[in-house]
Amino acid sequence: IAQPGCGPFSLTGQPTACGTAREVGTFSHRLPADLLVANEQHRRYTEAIWDLPQGYLDEIKAPGMHTVKMFRELSKGNIDFMWSAHNNWAQSMPNLTRFLGEGADNKGIFDTFIVVNEVYPTLSTQYADVVLPVALWVEREGQFGNAERRTAVFEKAVDAPGEAKWDLWTFMEVAHRVLDGEKIGSEDAFDHLFGFIYDKNARDFKNDDRETNRLLWEEYRIFSNPEMNDKAKAINDDTDGTFGAKLK
């Protein structure tokens, strides 16, 4: 402790679990701000922040597969499609050969349609059916979760080369196709969820990278500052105080 390289905070994850997974809810069992999909009150709170009908998130109350489980199922031929971003799983997953295929039918990675977002060739892109060229961290706006749990905002320095795009652009383009024809109340589902940043008809963000990043950050801040959203505040002010205590 208190020696170089011996700090109390872990450098966790693939690639940054405290910044891109725990805080924003990309784990299969998590919602943003370390809330849990299995906790009904956490789901109601998240619905209030995202302006979703009560019960909308109940469909995900049973967590999906964690990473190792997902790759185990992939090796059995039970995963039809996998899309990876921000990590090089073919390099970092332990004993990858066990995922290449097992059992009489020898199913595995080669039976799964794999999409990889990357900036240069890696072991993961060698297994990919489709590689989407994306921007490096200096070629777009973004945040990074530091070991001491502060969030650092980094600014775009240069344009991405060629046809490379912000990862978020690829997610938006797939999302509006997946949600095509879906409604939340009387509103188009994609526009309800993402219309504040993205114009699906123009296939582009409504603002520049900096403003888009700011809008997303301000939305995320509500999870730890319910005063910014009256509906979320009402749920946070529970009678026994347990929910508010967990948030703090």
Q: Would you name each region that the model predicts?
A:
Residues 1-116, 121-248:
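Domain-level signature for respiratory redox metalloenzymes
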